[in-house]
Structure formats: C-alpha cells, structure tokens
Amino acid sequence: VDHANYVVNEFLRMLSTGITRTQRDATYFAEQLHVSLKYLSRVVKRTTGETITSYIDRATIPILRKYLDEERLSLTQISDIMNFTSLSYFSRYCSKHLGMTPSKYRSSKV
C-alpha cells in the first residue's frame, strides 16, 4: 500500500472511531497523521473524489442527531460536549447539515 492510500485509510479509520464528537478541524487530522493539511486534502480528494470536510461532516451528523434525539441534554450542553465554539455556531452547523435549527429539529421529532 502506498503512502497516500495509507493516509486516506487512517483518516477514514479515525473518523470511524467517533472522534468527530469533539474534533472536526481538518488540521487536527493532518497533525495526527503527520502530514500537511494540503497533502491530506489532496490525497483524500484524489483517492475518494470527496473533500475532507464532507467526510468529517458525514461522520458528525449521526452523532449530532443522537444527542439531539436525547431530550435530557440542553442545546448548550450538546454544543459544549461536541466542542462547538459557540451556541450560535452550533445552531448554524445544524441548520446547514440538518436543514433546520437544533430546536426545530427537536420539535419535529415529537
């Protein structure tokens, strides 16, 4: 296996561990894999046809939905647990990836 395939496989393995619950910064993954962000971006895109961010988001969404489906945690608690920098960023992230704000997502599940 060449280095590029190894890096891509390790990146995907890292995502499968649930790490995106707290880590969604592409730079973090590059550092953990001891490669530059530019290299990681290039080999993931070349090997899979997708961006690093799309993989990170796809790994994050099920975790996010799970927390939102658990009524016992407030939106602030979920935002904190998942290391979002602010509640407003958390809300924007949900709107972008779930098509609605976290509170609307919750009320739609009732």
Regions found by a protein language model. Name each.
Residues 1-11, 18-33, 46-54, 58:
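Short, Lys/Arg-enriched, Trp-marked, Pro/Gly-tolerant hinge/linker segments that flank
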Residues 10-25, 44, 48, 65-74, ...:
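Basic, amphipathic alpha-helical hairpins
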Residues 27, 38, 74-77, 87-88:
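Residues within helix-turn-helix
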Residues 27, 53, 76, 92, ...:
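Residues within the helices of the helix-turn-helix
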Residues 32, 81-82, 97:
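Residues within the alpha-helical elements of helix-turn-helix
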Residues 40, 89-90, 94:
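Short hydrophobic/aromatic patch on the recognition helix
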Residues 47-85, 107-110:
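Terminal helix-turn-helix DNA-binding modules in bacterial transcription factors
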Residues 92-110:
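…primarily DNA-binding HTH/wHTH and HhH modules…
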